[in-house]
Amino acid sequence: MQQPLEQAVAETILQRFESFYSRFLEITQGSKSRFENSDWLGVQLAGRERIRLYDHHVGATTALIKQMMGATLPSQALLKQVKGAFSDLLPKCENFEVAESFFNSVYRRIFRHRNIRDENLYIHPFRSRGEHPDLSALLRIYRTDLAHLPQTLSQLLGDYSFTLPYEDKQRDIVDIQRHLAENGPAILHDEPFAIELLKEVFYRNKGAYLVGLIRVKGQVFPFILPLLSTGQSIYVDTVIFEPELASIVFGFARAYFMVYAPMPALFVLFLRQIMPHKPDYEIYNAIGCQKHGKTELYRHYQQHLAQSREQFVIAPGIKGMVMSVFTLPSYDVVFKVIKDEFTPPKDVSHEQVKAKYRLVKQHDRVGRMADTQEFTNFEFPLDRISPELLAELKTVAPSALTLTDDKLVIKHLYTERKMIPLNLYLDKADEQQTRLALEEYGNAIKQLAAANIFPGDMLFKNFGVTRHGRVVFYDYDEICYMTECNFRQIPPPRYPEDEWSAEPWYSVAPNDIFPEEFATFLLQKPQVRDIMMQLHKELFDANYWKMLQSNIKEGVFEDVYPYRRKKRFKFQRGG
């Protein structure tokens, strides 16, 4: 007897999902070996391959389902039956949350992001793990107090085995205990506590992270140990117990962690305890499930929309030449729409802009480039769009809009975490805030450059300040690889009148960049000029940029830490 079509389609989608996630975990599992062997190029390549997996498998699955269904579009009755059959299979799937997202992606790909109905796909989750699922199988739990902490830490570090030995385990134990005793929560001095660590190690860039929490008298504090490698041995670089720093470690501007998580939802539930203010979608993104993070973001957005009454408005700041940006004032996300025509002198195409955003998605963002999600045919309630915003969108991006009686549908947009534009921040900052922001700004450019990214347009308006005070780049239409740039010094004028000429007295090729010119548009205010020349004067020297290029070409991978240098034990010991 032939299997019903809806059953065959549902089983095929689930099988293809499991094939995708099996390969996802296989790539992830190689992280330990890459860390132990200091295979930093392999780290980058594996990260890119893993990001590309999802779309590849969704595309292949879509083609197969279309073949199974035939040339005619399926009826609404059949679509409901397919979802029903898939829902019947979910109890057997341990990673059902991400499986729902995979089903959604296949459905949307088939229907080109139209016919989005709750009865056809998983706008709301079908299953739940409940409020308090048992996480004990994921954890190692150590009960101790400050007096017995050295013995506990010795056991703890020994439980995480690597082919490389610890450089000096006793030194690391002393550093951890000292830092907790001097700077940790005061309650640790008076009460016994438990350290709960996830058994699986989190890998990113050159680091391996033991991630967990301290539980004491009903209170919870993060407990994160970043491990680094010398090539011959490993060492503990610091201990993180501050919720704010834990949030930065899992920040939206960093590369995705590699952690072996067959059931990522359980990891998210655990991590939520140490980052209670970070939404689930950002945690899913951080552990590499960014496509399910997109599903969670959409659900989060729908929930916020239902609980608020305000209107979407044009985002504060200088209007972009390429993007129109808007937001809901109470929501921590901005929406970015590519304009139909770009404001001169911008000379890029729509496809080039999209390619830049794809580049950022697959590149190591080193904590300095905001992650984005890409949406097609995104719907907004028309009565929630302010008149000014609607007029703006009709003016700059009419081809992207579809209006119905009660909806505004935008054909293509990006979402991004909301930040304060750096230029607006500096307008209101006092002297200390200005200095810290400019220090962050220069560090952001240097770290991006060391990661082979040249921002292109370095105006302050293209950078944002996060709630933690970090400066992050978010305007990608002019980025390029450092290795594509030709950094030059401006040649001396041939004659005195050359300096007054409207045209340069030297030839300029498309990829020529003159760092001396950065000062013209960045250092107009005396206070900004003084601070930048104190902290980052090398940014205006072509030789500095050439040195960075040389490092990149020689395969030098810079160290980038998700915490300040003074937090490192090596710095505290005077190393």
Curated annotation (Swiss-Prot):
Q: What Gene Ontology molecular function terms does this protein carry? A: [isocitrate dehydrogenase (NADP+)] kinase activity; AMP binding; ATP binding; phosphoprotein phosphatase activity; protein serine/threonine kinase activity
Q: Which domain of life is it from?
A: Bacteria
Per the record, what is one GO cellular component? cytoplasm
Q: Where in the cell is it found?
A: Cytoplasm
Q: What Enzyme Commission number(s) appear in the record?
A: 2.7.11.5, 3.1.3.-
User: What UniProt keywords are attached to this protein's entry?
Assistant: ATP-binding, Cytoplasm, Glyoxylate bypass, Hydrolase, Kinase, Nucleotide-binding, Protein phosphatase, Serine/threonine-protein kinase, Transferase, Tricarboxylic acid cycle
Residues noted as binding ATP in the record, renumbered to the chain: A315, P316, G317, I318, K319, G320, M321, K336
Q: Which GO terms describe its biological process?
A: glucose metabolic process; glyoxylate cycle; tricarboxylic acid cycle
Do you know which Pfam families this protein is assigned to?
Answer: AceK_kinase, AceK_regulatory
Q: Which residues form the active site?
A: D371
Reaction(s) catalysed (UniProt annotation): L-seryl-[isocitrate dehydrogenase] + ATP = O-phospho-L-seryl-[isocitrate dehydrogenase] + ADP + H(+)
Under the heading NCBIfam families, the entry gives: PRK02946.1
Against HAMAP family, the record matches this protein to: AceK
Function (record text): Bifunctional enzyme which can phosphorylate or dephosphorylate isocitrate dehydrogenase (IDH) on a specific serine residue. This is a regulatory mechanism which enables bacteria to bypass the Krebs cycle via the glyoxylate shunt in response to the source of carbon. When bacteria are grown on glucose, IDH is fully active and unphosphorylated, but when grown on acetate or ethanol, the activity of IDH declines drastically concomitant with its phosphorylation.
The record's listing under PANTHER family reads:
ISOCITRATE DEHYDROGENASE KINASE_PHOSPHATASE, PTHR39559
Q: Which family does it belong to?
A: Belongs to the AceK family.
The name this protein carries in UniProt is Isocitrate dehydrogenase kinase/phosphatase
Q: Species name for this entry? A: Aeromonas hydrophila subsp. hydrophila (strain ATCC 7966 / DSM 30187 / BCRC 13018 / CCUG 14551 / JCM 1027 / KCTC 2358 / NCIMB 9240 / NCTC 8049)
Which gene does this sequence derive from? aceK
